[in-house]
Amino acid sequence: MRSYELPKSNIYHSAGSSEGTQVKFFSDGKWFKQDLNGYEGETEYIVSCLLSCSNISDYVTYEKCMINGKAGCVSKNFLRENETFITFERLHFSYTGQHMLDAVMVYSDIKERIEYVRQFIKKNTSLDISGYLSNIFSVDALTLNYDRHFNNLGIIYDSEKNIFREAPVFDNGAGLLSNVSRFPVFRSIEENSEHIAGQPICANLDLQAYYAGITLQIDYEMFENLYIQTLKPSRALLVLKYQLQQKRKLFPDLKKN
């Protein structure tokens, strides 16, 4: 595991979430995030390992590291020259003056909430984000990532070409019960998972994924051989193994399709 010493001048300040804000640095085209509530960095790493054995190709690869003496993770910047990541919240507020969550929650039906988001992005960027939402919400359901919100869902804008493109799957660190204060280690995985309340469409992560359309497929044998048998045992890995067993019918085997 590599260790980095980064100056405070490289700290990046961004909008936080309900879980607080991880200290983030940007240096030499890479993003560095220190753990805040538990083992977010390890979760980012393990989830990206899983995605390397899936049918999702557009995702950010993370590596575990030490940052100024604290555990965390590092990833390459996914933005190209002249590109900016624009969150759904920022885009929605700039066009309507209203928070996207407030607009979405006007609808009582889960499907209608998702459709509102799709149609808003389609109208203002010409992007069909159906596949993006399917990928994101499927990964969240599998990994128990309850901290997805309209400030880490977004699209990418190229200011030179004046075009938009989908963002990759990233920011998965709140999954796998990584917040040890909220999901203490003395509770079983089953007990902790019962306390998961998802975002941003509904509290049930499985329903959120279902109504977005589940397309995630996993090469279970590849993941077993490349990672489960080789990675150091950890709570994050244990939670993922449990979830893969519980959700196997929801996320089919890539080799059998």
Q: Which residues fall in each region the model found?
A:
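Anionic ligand-binding catalytic core segments
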Residues: 1-135, 142-145, 150, 154-257
